[in-house]
């Protein structure tokens, strides 16, 4: 509750707008409906905040909270129960994870997704591309925050590489521990705007959160050997900032695998795909085919070869994950079918 008290103290405006309420939510409920926004999701309860302040809802007794995510809006019953989760404007949904493919909503109703990466061994264009695809696929505007700018004299090089991945993507290079260096980011924050931080463990998401005004997020040292973090943040939670914006700090992501993100891919790889439209063959694989506009662009330096490789790798990975997902669904269908058959034969035996 100490955490909840700190958050309560930080909220300066009590109106729903300060919690991120928009016309999209207003259109879904009656004018005097009771609503609250989800600030943290725990195993047994959730923390919500509405015009009346902070509250905790027990998941078992409330019901109706399956799949609830930080950032969701809830319509409450007169008795304080949960009537329903309002339709989301958008959701950062992780559709696949390593061997176990599943869908997981990381943050809901997000205005700005800050993809955090560091100027050290963690920096990877491939990884950044994945995060950008995820953001674009979820219809959220991405921004890149390059932390640990103080640890390199190559900041401009890192920033240029990051910016080259998606036309117009803002890149903020900072020492995330410095309130002064994050000043421009803070100045851009608006009342009721929801920001979410995602990235690997140890890149400085919580450090950045603290610098932009979140109340004392826990941070932890990284391993010297490989710059990997130790998964310090374990709970997804949202915090009001002094600027009036809301910040969702996420735990570090181990490995971001993608499936079913074709829309995101088509946006992030628009450069490769628009060249591909000019290939002589419609089904060109951009290998040895004659008249390949993609190969031509690579040969004369207009397109970095790694962009094509990235696109092809992501497509292969998507296809593999889609297969795993489909075989899981099939297995679930088979089990459901067997179960129904068993129940049916039991009832038949009992003569029901
Ligand atoms: N030098 C330097 N250190 C930083 C910077 N940002 C973060 N750190 C340090 O990096 C370590 C990890 O920072 P965290 O904020 O805990 O990282 P995180 O992304 O929240 O990690 P998880 O919660 O594990 O996902 C801490 O020791 C921070 O002090 C930076 O810009 N410069
Ligand atoms: Mg953290
Ligand atoms: Zn081609």
Question: For each predicted feature, which ranges?
Answer:
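Helix-rich effector regions associated with P-loop NTPase G domains
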Residues: 1-14, 32, 66-81, 85-112, ...
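Short aromatic-glycine-enriched beta-strand elements
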Residues: 44-48
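Beta-strand/loop nucleic-acid-binding surfaces
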Residues: 54-70
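Canonical P-loop GTPase G-domain recognition
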Residues: 141, 148-203
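Short, charged beta-turn/beta-strand-edge "cap" motif at the junction between a beta-strand
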Residues: 78-82, 121, 201
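Structural detector for short beta-strands of small beta-barrel domains
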Residues: 32-42
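Histidine-anchored nucleotide/phosphate-binding helix
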Residues: 126-136, 141
């Amino acid at each position: 509750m100490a955490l909840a008290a700190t958050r309560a103290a930080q909220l300066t405006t009590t109106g729903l707008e300060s919690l991120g309420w928009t016309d999209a939510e207003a259109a879904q409920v009656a004018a005097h409906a009771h609503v609250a926004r989800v600030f943290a999701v725990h195993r047994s309860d959730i923390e919500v905040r509405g015009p009346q302040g902070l509250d905790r809802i027990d998941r078992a007794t409330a019901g109706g909270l399956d799949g609830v995510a930080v950032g969701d809006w809830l319509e409450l019953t007169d008795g304080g129960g949960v009537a329903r989760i309002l339709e989301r404007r958008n959701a950062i949904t992780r559709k696949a994870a390593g061997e176990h493919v599943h869908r997981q909503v990381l943050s809901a109703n997000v205005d700005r997704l800050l993809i955090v990466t560091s100027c050290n061994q963690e920096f990877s264009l491939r990884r950044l591309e994945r995060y950008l695809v995820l953001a674009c696929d979820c219809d959220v505007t991405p921004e890149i925050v390059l932390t640990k700018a103080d640890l390199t004299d190559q900041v401009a090089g890192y920033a240029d590489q990051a910016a080259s991945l998606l036309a117009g993507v803002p890149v903020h290079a900072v020492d995330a521990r410095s309130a002064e260096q994050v000043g421009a980011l803070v100045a851009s924050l608006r009342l009721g705007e929801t920001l979410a931080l995602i990235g690997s463990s140890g890149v400085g998401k919580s450090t950045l959160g603290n610098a932009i005004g979140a109340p004392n997020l826990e941070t932890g040292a990284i391993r010297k050997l490989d710059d990997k973090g130790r998964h310090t943040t374990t709970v997804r939670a949202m915090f009001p900032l002094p600027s009036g914006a809301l910040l969702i700090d996420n735990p570090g992501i181990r490995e971001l695998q993608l499936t079913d993100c074709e829309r995101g891919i088509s946006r992030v790889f628009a450069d490769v795909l628009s060249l591909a439209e000019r290939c002589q063959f419609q089904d060109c694989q951009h290998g040895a085919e004659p008249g390949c506009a993609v190969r031509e662009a690579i040969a004369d330096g207009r397109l970095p070869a790694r962009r094509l490789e990235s696109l092809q790798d992501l497509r292969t990975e998507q296809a593999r994950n889609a297969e795993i997902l489909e075989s899981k669904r099939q297995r679930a269908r088979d089990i459901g079918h067997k179960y129904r058959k068993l129940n049916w034969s039991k009832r038949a035996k009992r003569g029901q």
